[in-house]
Amino acid sequence: MDGFTDSQAPPAYEEVKWLADTLVAFMGIGWLINYGAMIRHSYQGRTYCMGIIPLCNNIGWELVYTLVHPSSNRVELAVFAAGVTLNVIIMFAATRSAKTEWQHSPLVANHTPLIFLGGTFVCFAGHVALAAEIGPALAYSWGAVICQLVLSIGGVCQLLQRNTTRGTSVTLWLSRFLGSCCTVGFAFLRWRYWPEAFAWLAGPLVLWSLATFVLADITYGVCLYLISQTETSSTKRSKLK
């Protein structure tokens, strides 16, 4: 069953298709806000907001399902096209700020463009291989799961390693988290009203991935708040001196 098309959807799903499409649109809006905010933060703070591996993985996945296996859903395809465009801009911004961010590692700082290009190619090839192995429809969903987990867990690690809110904000976190939650809602509708094709979405590995994503992103929000409070307290103490 093609995971992109609704042409063979049962009547039960057709009744809620408007809601599914709305969730896809809101997912796109959330992520586009996130990408736009990342670009702004990158140029204001001279740093990048998304880790190297998650960024390469996202671009590789988006390229596959924009160019190699494009969705027949126009809303979804438009979201992919806009996402990959903004991600490339984010990559340029990250390359621009690499010398500042990687002062402790000249090998990375001086070869960031090559690292990004190589990383994106490897991830792109991996997603193409996954589509060839299990089919584009399933690979699309599992590729998205991989991207989300790498991004969520990587984001927590990056925040804890930096121990600063530089390069991040509540807007960045919420737009990403809520955008991904809309994707979860879309998947729920397909599982609930189209079980013939999407019963696998209630499988153990999918549910583990969902729980891990939610736990990681909530952890990110809590850590962001705690670090922000520490920075605020430090600023107040500095002003009193």
From Swiss-Prot:
Q: In which pathway does it act?
A: Secondary metabolite biosynthesis
* InterPro entries for the chain: PaxB-like
Q: How does it sit in the membrane?
A: Multi-pass membrane protein
Q: Which domain of life is it from?
A: Eukaryota
Subcellular localization, per the record? Membrane
Which family does the record assign?
A: Belongs to the paxB family.
Q: What protein name applies here?
A: Terpene cyclase terB
Provide the species name.
Answer: Tolypocladium album (Soil fungus)
Q: Which gene encodes it?
A: terB
